């Protein structure tokens, strides 16, 4: 019914959606992004494993709408337990007390390519790094914060919900 029964698919289909790719502005790259904490939550891992790229971006779209309406550049999406999961299309890192922190995949963070590169570089440079559950308060009180993504690369964060991030 409704075309969602996989047994009714005799052959595979390829769908390509092409549109203008809008990258992060140079202003945001130089001045830093302004973030909000979205009220829209990330689906729980037992509902939709964050490692599955299913193109089901409804929660991220809803969070992005919240960011747009708030005049922010991006939204931080929390998981069902209230821990930081990720941005709408990027991973989040904070630096606190000299330690680089990012949410673990078990907190519904995307196991992103750029995220893993950052963790590998930190390891090679002997920079203390941990995958650890992060609260919104941890982000508010971070010494530094940045976002990563394949298209976004690395984006500094200057404020979260109007609170300025201290720069080390």
Language-model region placement:
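Helix-start/capping segments and mature chain N-termini
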Residues: 2-168
């Amino acid at each position: 019914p409704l075309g969602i029964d996989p047994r009714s698919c005799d052959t595979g289909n390829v769908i390509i959606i092409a549109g203008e790719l809008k990258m992060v502005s140079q202003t945001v790259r130089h001045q830093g992004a302004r973030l909000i904490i979205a009220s829209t939550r990330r689906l729980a891992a037992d509902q939709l494993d964050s490692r599955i790229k299913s193109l089901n971006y409804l929660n991220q779209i809803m969070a992005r709408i919240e960011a747009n309406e708030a005049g922010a550049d991006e939204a931080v999406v929390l998981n069902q337990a209230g821990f930081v999961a990720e941005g709408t299309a990027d991973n989040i890192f904070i630096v606190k007390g000299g330690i680089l922190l990012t949410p673990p995949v078990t907190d519904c963070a995307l196991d992103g390519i750029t995220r893993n590169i950052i963790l590998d570089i930190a390891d090679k440079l002997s920079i203390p790094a941990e995958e650890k559950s992060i609260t919104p308060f941890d982000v508010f009180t971070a010494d530094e914060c940045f976002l990563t993504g394949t298209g976004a690369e690395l984006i500094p964060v200057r404020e979260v919900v109007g609170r300025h991030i201290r720069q080390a």
